[in-house]
Amino acid sequence: MKLTTHLPHLSFAVLATAILVSQTAPAQADGLPDPGFDVVPGLTALVVTDPQNDFLSPNGVAWGVVGASVEANGTIENIDALFTAAHDTGMPVFVSPHYYFPQDHNWQFEGALEVLMHKIGMFDRSDALSIDGFEGSGADWLESYKPHIEHENTIVTSPHKVFGPETNDLVLQLRKRGISKIILSGMSANLCTESHMRELQEQGFEVMVVSDATAAAQLPGLDGYAAALTNFRMIASHVADTDATVAAIRAAH
């Protein structure tokens, strides 16, 4: 167990939170260090990627490949639990959505999943300045999340376009609110969630990932969730499940 104590002014509650997160993390037999993650009020935020119907609703266009992973992880319920814990304690929440507008379908070259997403109309919206047809669409929020996302404590960023936050204003919004520590969750694990983890790390944020508050596509010979877990472990400061993370959030406030 490694407890970070680089902030000498931390309260006992915050120190206890860091211990709690470390103690409830799965035992590691991979030989890698676990730097840990302390939840510090005022510096820590919850970031949720793509909490939208196309990933999380059985009617979504990606459900056929992600649904089994979503259900196995309890992803919908776990993201909800994180939203609730954040709002109950006043922790700021940032949602990074994925939208495609008509002009995005005119790109001259694309990667494999960009081609697929555009082909199946994933996250499509009619116009950047219109919400015509948005309600209940694949680009809309999962219905049960709307009270959380419409909450006064939630900041919805501009949309990212491929996978990472390089194409939206998430980093700006975090910095403008003095956030330096990120609890990351959302969809999908090896794509937008992992890409957000990587870029936020590069931008100097401390990032932990909630391993069962995400999920990924499973295809013949390809397991996006397993791939993501490997990279979460190798890159993030800490990986923990929802129960441990919620307990840590509540203990810190």
Predicted regions, residues:
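Active-site-adjacent betaalpha module
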Residues: 28-45, 54, 88-89, 106, ...
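Short, well-ordered beta-to-alpha junction loops that form the rim of enzyme active sites
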Residues: 96-99, 187
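Short catalytic/ligand-binding loop motif for oxyanion handling, primarily in non-cytosolic enzymes
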Residues: 101-105
